[in-house]
Amino acid sequence: MRHSFSQAARSALALGLFAAGLGLSGAAMAQEPLIFVHGYSGSSSNFDAMVMRFTASGYPRSKLYGFNYNSLMSSDRTSASSLNSFINSVRASNGNQPVSVIAHSNGGLVVRWQRAKLGGEAGMRRFITLGTPHKGTTSAYGCYSPACFDMRPGSSFITQLAGAGCDRSLWSANDGVILPARNAQCGTNVQTASVGHIALLTDTSVYNQVRAQLP
């Protein structure tokens, strides 16, 4: 259940963040566990930049968790079941505190299923998606795997969700992967700077918007 954010990236980014004067400005943030859920064909190391910004702002490193799942082979339903077990384990290790979850791309669909179909909403204080194909993306017609089928507009997975399980969605008009871009909107929508799909993970202004959405 341990984190798998890359040590090299953490060290390098930390130096840059402190040089930029970010310091420990976020000490007043809630100290609940944060769980990061990657997108299709990704890994928790995709969140290295964001994790370092959290730790540089004073968030305890011990409260940051990365969830990995086999997005190339597993359906989003299967991944949601694994996520449910992971979240229960994290909560048990933290006095049964509620968690907040930050998910990128397809990871947001995995979390929504866990919230809407597996009872996960009760143990989650905040859920933030970054470029998630809530209503599907036409780019998913270019790949062939269970998760790709789930991400297609009008899929049985998206139809069964029927808009449930959303909370806060951050989306970019220049995403380039979620097509059309408005399909990344669900729940309370927050438009980011016009950055690409991957840059949602590393852009400083997007990180600041994520922080602003946390309770």
Which residues fall in each region the model found?
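C-terminal catalytic-base region of ester-bond hydrolases, centering on the histidine
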Residues: 148-215
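Residues at alpha-helix caps and immediate loop-helix transition turns in enzyme cores, especially N-
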Residues: 46-47, 78-79, 202, 206
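Boundary at the C-terminal end of the N-terminal hydrophobic targeting segment
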Residues: 28-30
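A short, Lys/Arg-enriched amphipathic alpha-helix followed by its capping loop at the start of a domain
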Residues: 50-59
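Serine-dependent carboxylesterase/thioesterase catalytic core
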Residues: 32-38, 45, 58-61, 66-67, ...
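Bacterial N-terminal signal peptides that target proteins for export
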Residues: 2-15
